[in-house]
Amino acid sequence: MNDSTIFVLIAIALAIILIAILFTFVPVALWISAIAAGVKIGIFELVGMRLRRVVPARVVNPLIKAVKAGLDLDTSRLEGHYLAGGNVDRVVNALIAAQRANIDLSFERAAAIDLAGRDVLEAVQMSVNPKVIETPFIAGVAMDGIEVKAKARITVRANIDRLVGGAGEDTVIARVGEGIVSTIGSQNDHKKVLENPDMISQTVLSKGLDSGTAFEILSIDIADIDIGKNIGAELQTDQAQADKNIAQAKAEERRAMAVAKEQEMKARVEEMRAKVVEAEAEVPMALSEALRQGHMGVMDYMNYQNVMADTDMRDSISKASGTKEEQHSKNDPRNRNVDK
């Protein structure tokens, strides 16, 4: 093999390597597609995107769609939105949909909505085709104590001007629920709510609940209404039970105080008895002292003994007669019938 042949082979190899590098760093196929679609973009501009770590297809393909749709966009704005973390394809689709629906939406507004975390394409579609939000059953209590449950369907349309910074669906549902509860609670009779459910939707809709939200409420319709519990009766029952428990506690307290008082009186009786016994024990000593000092004679002492004997006899007789009367009363048939 001569030197000229080796040189040719080396040249071919270098050419292949250069072509591979060119097709790796320069999306030639994408550039050809853009040129064919009428998009003016230079091949070195695509190389610059590669160097800036931008996927050229993420910018060029949406640009092709925008040009075909008649939108006035350029690569610099699309590339800037991509570098900011936005979804270029979704923004372009939203702009195309807005143009077709005659909605005034600029690229800057669409990019801001996209960067705010909102789905700008869904917002445009919702502006054309309103969305229906269905709430769960919301319970309210009328003034007569009856619980009324209502489910509402909220028809909303996206307000593109308030998508950035506006509240979402949860806020709309919460506000509508608050309005339903307030409307039901202001009625004297729950039957009025059942007879005219449209009253709820009219009252809630007139409150301007969509202020500060990203939506415009078009209508509020009551989809279902039902009767719940008798909250008033349950509250009265609970109150009666609480009053009963309080009364029982107070009665138990009084009973405990009465028992304590009774025990105290028994203790005092025993104390008095002990004093009586103590005093009786001092009587013989006093008698002996009186006899010793001559204050009492023998006859006086004998009279005292007779009086004590008579007293003991009377006590024995009275106790015996009381026992017999009690036994006779128990054995009387008339008393038995009364007991029965």
Curated annotation (Swiss-Prot):
This is Flotillin-like protein FloA. It is a single-pass membrane protein. One of its GO terms (cellular component) is membrane raft. Residues 314-340 are annotated as: Disordered. HAMAP family: FloA. Homooligomerizes. It comes from the Bacteria. Belongs to the flotillin-like FloA family. Keywords: Cell membrane, Membrane, Transmembrane, Transmembrane helix. Found in functional membrane microdomains (FMM) that may be equivalent to eukaryotic membrane rafts. FMMs are highly dynamic and increase in number as cells age. Flotillins are thought to be important factors in membrane fluidity. It comes from Shouchella clausii (strain KSM-K16) (Alkalihalobacillus clausii). The chain crosses the membrane at residues 6-26. Coiled coil: none annotated. It is found in: Cell membrane; Membrane raft.
